[in-house]
Amino acid sequence: VKTVQREHYRVEKWEAYPLPGAAVPFLVLVPDTASDKNPVPVLFCIPGSDQTKEELAGETSPDLDQPSVQQPGNNAMAFHYVRQGWAAIVVDNAGTGEEGDAERAAGRSSHDYENLARFLLEMDWSWLGYTSYADQCILDWVKTRPWAQKNHIILSGFSLGTEPMMVLG
């Protein structure tokens, strides 16, 4: 969808479609040193219930049009790992961040688990099942990237993000 160059790395915004019409935006941070001749290890990050992928990537906006955070906090795991030469993938939990836009537009919080869980149950999915499936689709895609060390991928989740992380593991 978009690529922005940062100091010593680039941020790529992608969308996965695990189900027809179900767009799952995610961020890919790739160090400038990564290439098909020099693949790098990968960190796959899943935020907590009240975090977004942008926070973990040290970004200030989903559209990447703003400069990155000048001094990201300790939980900006993707940012800190890419600065150490790793690639990092960051995916919001289902119903949060950009996937929670309907809630934000209605003036509520940035997540809507209850309605999403109800809709998913009506389609014979659970929230954890759908979130884990979407993450697995993205993880499978990562393994096809020439810059990724396919045998050196770490999964990390914060709080609620540990649930799909454990399913992926």
What does each of the following model-derived ranges do?
Residues 12, 29, 76-77, 138, ...:
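Short, hydrophobic/aromatic alpha-helical segments in well-folded domains
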Residues 147-159:
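Alpha/beta-hydrolase fold nucleophile elbow
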Residues 141-148, 162:
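Conserved helix-loop functional segments at active or binding sites
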Residues 16-20, 30-33, 47-50, 95, ...:
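Short, flexible loop/turn elements at secondary-structure junctions
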